[in-house]
Amino acid sequence: MIETGRLRLSLHQMTDFNDLCAMWSDPDVVRHISGVPSSEQESWFRLLRYRGLWDLLGYGYWCVRTKADGRYVGDVGFADWKRDIEPPQDTVPEAGWVLARWAHGQGFATEALQAALAWMDGRGVDRTVCIIAPEHATSCRVAEKCGYFLKGSACFRGEQTLLLQRERDDR
C-alpha cells in the first residue's frame, strides 16, 4: 500500500469491482481513452488484468481511494500492454491513470501518479512512457507535472497519439 497526503493506493480487490465498473462505463471518463464505455464483462477482464500484472511483472495498477472516507478515486499504475503501436515500446513500463468523474480537477491524478512513480523509481526502473490523445490537455498537464516530456508521436489503433517519456529521478 502507498499513502499520500490525501490518497491510499492499494491492489484491487473484489470489493472494488462495482466502483471500477461504474467509472469505466462513464462516457465522460473514457472519452479520451477508448471513446467507448466498458461493459460489465470488459470491466471484469480489466480487474483480472490489473491483478495479473503484479504476479507476472512485479508491478501493475493500484486502486486509488481517498484516505478521509475511502471513496473510490480511480486507477493508476504501470503495465506492459504489448501494444500494437508504431514505434514499438518494447518492454518499457507504460504509465496510465483514470479517475472517476467526481474526482476530476482536484489534483488527485498528479498526486497518485507522483506516488506511483516514486515507487517505480525506488525499484530502479530507469524510464517509463505514456501515450495520451493529443486533445486530452488535462492528462498532458498531469504527465508534464510528473516529469514526462514529449518523445514524439505514435500510431495506435490507426490514430496519432502523443508518446511521452520520463527518466528516473535519481539517475
Predicted regions and their residues:
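Active-site beta->alpha N-cap acidic-glycine motif
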Residues: 35
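Acyl-donor (CoA/ACP) binding surface of acyl/acetyltransferases
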Residues: 1-32, 48, 63-171
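A short helix-loop-beta-strand connector motif used in the catalytic cores of GNAT acetyltransferases and
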Residues: 51-63
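Donor nucleotide-sugar recognition loop
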Residues: 38
